[in-house]
Every structure is written in structure tokens, then in C-alpha cells.
């Protein structure tokens, strides 16, 4: 039987599980907490950044046997890291398996995906209309020779569409993906959160919606297209679903620089927010 390894990544760390071992990699913020929570288990704590502690990539390469398989849920590992793991697997004449969420299969009481309401951020706060932002991104696409732009950064989607949400408790974003061409802007989200007010706003700005789960099938249809995306942000499954005939432009999302170049309204509101935060009890 071929040895298998599974890589699991979360905001606070990365777990690697083999047939005989399990390890958790985390940084200095969580050394104490992780040590306490792993006490009495068979999981080894790897303190990232400390001397003689291998990185996740080094550990995977060292422990993967010839012809072995590296597996992970392709939706939770970014495209660049996924490509690196692919290289490691190929070195050992093995393969990558990213089609299934094995944790989800055994996590029976997993909370459902958040479906919090979406609200529109008025131009009085953003200082720039959604139509203007979309036009600017389309110009950047032309400059790069891209026909399609795939956007997976929740921060950038919220900024571009002037919308906010509560799907993540500490960040006002909406769980979604976005596909932009010169003719279309398609927002993939849970359609239950789209009320009449939001639907009217989206139609006015030339934005159509599709179900969140439909994004991966949409990506498969982009044959012979030149696609702009940031592999450090989009996940491995997105990259793997692109047709072989598609040409990928791996570059920063145009919205990243556009967000940094704040207009007077955004500067003023940011200042007010910092003042309120400073005086908060």
C-alpha cells in the first residue's frame, strides 16, 4: 500500500498527518495554547521559526515515501503552495490528491456555511462608485492582456462591489467568488442572502449572481481564455479546474493597488474610524 499524507491548513497553523504520525505547525502566537491543547495526544507540535524545526514542505518531502500520495482539500490550500506540493510529489514519483474534503466526511456536527445578510456600502463612505471601480479593473485587464479575471479575495470583492457582510465574525465580508470579463461581472454567492434591494443594486451595476457552488464548474468552461488571477490567493482547486487550453496570468489582483490608493472620502472615514476606536471604552 502506498503511504499517504494529508495536509490541513487553517489560519492558525498547518497539520500534516501520515499513516503513523501527526504534526501541527504553528507560530509563536500559539506555542503555549497549542502545547496545552495537544497534551496527552499523539500529535507533535512543531514550533515554526525555531532552530532545527523543519518547515511543512521540508517535513513532507522528508517523510513522503517513493510513489506516495499527498492529499488535501483543494479549496483550502492556495495555488502556489499546491504547485509546490505537486513538485514534491513528482520528485518521489507520487501524486497529488485534492478532490475530497476528508475532514468534512468525519466532522458530523460541523456548523453550516454562514448565510448572513449582505448590505450595500453607500458611496458616501466608499467615495467611488462600483461602476467606476469595475471599469478601472477592466482597463487593468486590457493592459495585461487578460480576457477573464478570477477574484477570490473576500476583502477585494467587498471593496470592488461596495458591499459588506457578516459571514466572518471579525471581518465584514461575504463568502463568495467573482469572475469579471469586459462584458460580464458574475458574483458567485449563496443566493439566499440576495434580497430585493441588493438584487436591484447589482442589476443597476451590471452584476449577475450565480450559486456559490457553481464557481468551480464555471472555471472549467474557460477554454482558450487568458485568465488573470493571483495563485497566492486563489485555491488549488480553482487552478486545477482551469482547462488545459486556458492561459494563466499569475499576478497581483488589480484591486490590491487600487485599494491602497485611497480617495479623500476613504481617507476621511478611515481617520474618523481610528479616532472612534481610540476613544472606545
PLM features per residue range, with description:
Residues 3-8:
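Short, small-residue-biased leader/transition segments that mark boundaries at the very start
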Residues 13-17, 177-180:
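Short beta-strand scaffold segments in enzyme catalytic cores
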Amino acid at each position: 500500500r502506498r503511504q499517504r499524507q494529508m495536509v490541513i491548513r487553517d489560519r492558525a497553523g498547518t497539520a500534516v498527518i501520515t499513516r503513523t504520525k501527526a504534526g501541527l505547525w504553528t507560530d509563536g502566537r500559539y506555542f503555549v495554547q497549542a502545547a496545552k491543547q495537544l497534551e496527552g495526544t499523539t500529535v507533535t507540535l512543531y514550533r515554526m521559526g525555531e532552530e532545527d524545526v523543519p518547515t511543512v514542505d521540508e517535513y513532507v518531502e522528508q517523510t513522503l515515501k517513493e510513489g506516495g500520495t499527498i492529499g488535501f482539500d483543494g479549496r483550502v490550500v492556495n495555488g502556489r503552495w499546491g504547485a509546490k506540493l505537486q513538485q514534491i510529489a513528482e520528485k518521489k514519483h507520487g501524486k497529488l490528491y485534492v478532490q475530497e474534503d476528508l475532514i468534512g466526511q468525519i466532522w458530523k456536527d460541523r456548523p453550516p456555511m454562514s448565510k448572513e445578510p449582505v448590505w450595500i456600502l453607500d458611496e458616501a463612505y466608499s467615495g467611488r462608485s462600483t461602476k467606476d471601480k469595475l471599469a478601472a479593473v477592466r482597463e487593468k485587464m486590457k493592459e495585461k492582456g487578460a480576457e477573464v479575471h478570477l477574484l477570490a479575495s473576500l476583502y477585494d470583492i467587498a471593496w470592488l462591489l461596495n458591499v459588506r457582510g457578516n459571514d466572518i465574525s471579525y471581518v465584514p465580508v461575504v463568502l463568495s467568488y467573482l469572475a469579471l470579463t469586459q462584458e460580464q461581472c458574475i458574483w458567485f454567492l449563496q443566493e439566499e442572502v440576495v434580497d430585493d434591494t441588493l438584487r436591484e443594486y447589482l442589476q443597476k451595476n451590471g452584476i449577475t449572481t450565480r450559486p456559490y457552488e457553481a464557481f468551480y464548474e464555471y472555471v472549467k468552461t474557460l477554454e482558450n481564455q487568458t485568465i488573470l488571477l493571483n495563485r497566492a490567493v486563489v485555491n488549488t482547486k480553482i487552478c486545477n479546474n482551469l482547462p488545459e487550453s486556458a492561459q494563466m496570468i499569475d499576478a497581483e489582483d488589480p484591486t490590491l493597488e487600487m485599494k491602497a490608493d485611497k480617495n479623500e472620502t476613504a481617507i476621511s472615514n478611515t481617520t474618523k474610524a481610528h479616532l472612534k476606536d481610540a476613544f472606545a471604552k
